[in-house]
């Protein structure tokens, strides 16, 4: 609501100007974090949709036009399950099996958070993912990675940390990503930790 008042009644065709207004005029915009930027993004997407409809062009044309005939997709957040097989994963075998399941649907890349649940599918507290992580935590993550590699071969793996790790633990898990040739490491720290 605080941000929407900055664009209501304005010309929706002036998308860049309105984005700058939301970012700079709002008390919350600059350095506002993921909630504020999600709100700005939602409004910006709506404005681009309006602009595309007025000009009778798809939004991708507004953003520079078509570049690729197809875009690669990955199966995301597999620690929660896949398709009708929904629920947290705990064991290394469960991580590997759910990745195989996604690959059977045609995916050749997967994204998982290895830090959310322990082997018994219980939530891992954030504090246990920060600093010098325990040997057990580190081994659990590596066991899951090894199981996926053994079951799925050269599937591209993205490690998603949801900002739950800090610099120290993020680097440690990043070393595992290097060791097992990961495709990417996503959000190893929160946006508020620029180091």
Locate the predicted segments by residue.
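Active-site phosphate/pyrophosphate- and oxyanion-stabilizing loops and adjacent acidic/basic residues
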Residues: 49, 61, 146
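Short, well-ordered coil loops that connect the C-terminus of an alpha-helix to the N-terminus
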Residues: 9, 57, 65, 153-154, ...
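N-terminal amphipathic alpha-helix/helix-capping segment at the start of soluble metabolic enzymes
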Residues: 22, 53, 57-71
């Amino acid at each position: 609501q605080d941000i929407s008042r900055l664009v209501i009644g304005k010309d929706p065709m002036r998308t860049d100007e309105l984005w700058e207004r939301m970012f700079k005029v709002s008390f919350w915009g600059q350095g506002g974090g993921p909630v504020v930027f999600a709100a700005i993004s939602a409004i910006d997407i709506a404005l681009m949709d309006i602009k595309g409809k007025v000009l009778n062009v798809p939004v991708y044309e507004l953003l520079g036009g078509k570049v690729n005939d197809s875009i690669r997709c990955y199966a995301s957040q597999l620690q929660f399950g896949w398709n009708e097989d929904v629920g947290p994963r705990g064991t290394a075998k469960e991580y590997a099996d759910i990745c195989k399941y996604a690959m059977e649907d045609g995916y050749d890349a997967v994204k998982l958070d290895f830090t959310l649940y322990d082997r018994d599918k219980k939530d891992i507290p954030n504090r246990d993912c920060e600093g010098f992580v325990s040997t057990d935590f580190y081994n659990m993550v590596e066991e899951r990675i090894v199981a996926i590699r053994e079951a799925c071969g050269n599937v591209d793996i993205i490690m998603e940390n949801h900002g739950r790790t800090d610099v120290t633990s993020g680097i440690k898990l990043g070393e595992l990503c290097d060791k097992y040739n990961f495709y990417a490491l996503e959000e190893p720290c929160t946006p508020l930790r620029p180091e």
